[in-house]
Every structure is written in C-alpha cells, then in structure tokens.
Amino acid sequence: MTTPNLLPNAAADLARNGDANGLSALLKGGLAVDARDAKGNTLLMLASYHGRAEVVKLLLKSGATVDLRNDKGQTPLGGVAFKGYVEIANLLLDAGADPVADQGGSTPADFATLAGKTEILALLQARRDNAAKPTRWYSKLIGWVRK
C-alpha cells in the first residue's frame, strides 16, 4: 500500500516502546497523527497492540482516527481484544471505536474469545449492549408513535 504519510521507523518505535514524550515532540514537529507504516499500521494501532496506554491517550488527544484499519483490515480495538488490554480497550471505546467492527470476517469479540480474554469479552458485550439501548429521546418518540 502506498501512502503519502508513510510513518518513519523512529516514530513507529516510539509508539511501540511507549515513549510518549518523544512521540509528542514529533507530533508537534509536524508528524501526521494518522501516518502509517509499510503494513498500514498507524501509531495508534502500534501503541495499542503493545499495551502503551499513555501513548494511546496522547494520540487520541492529538486527534488520531480510532478505527483506521491496517492492510489486514484490523482496527486497534481488534488487536487490543486479542491481547487483553482492558484499559486501552476502554480508551478506544470511549473515543468511539466500533465494538463490533468486521475485521476480515471477525470482530473484536471473536479475537477476545480466541485468545481467552474473558474480561475484554465482557467489556465488549457491555459496550455493545449499551450502544443498542434506545436513547431517551428515541424512547419518547417510540412511546408517542405507539399512542
């Protein structure tokens, strides 16, 4: 995949290794927050998959797109579900990550099940159930329509 904002190896290493200060300096210097490596992984994907919560917080605060997929069609939440990083899963979900995004025929819950990450599986189920609940205005609208 050819991308105009190819991620420098040094930035990818900072994300993988959890160097929030070094990465912050690069972002302030103009590094695109959604730049990708040769496999389509963003900084957010790399930091998430390697369990680097502080870097994930920095990237989300800097405007990283939470559901960008890599070349395999995977999102950061899918990788986190497989690894079992509950704190990072919460950060991604709070930032709007889709808890049921199809990733090549699998969902984050499928990855959590495969890896035996029951705490992540419960979190994804709860978030999915909460997302499916009607909002207050929707409930009022349904009540009005039924009258």
Where do the language-model regions lie?
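Intrinsically disordered, low-complexity regulatory segments in ankyrin-centric signaling systems
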Residues: 1-29, 38, 130-147
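Conserved ankyrin/ankyrin-like repeat signature
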Residues: 22, 54-55, 87-88, 119-120
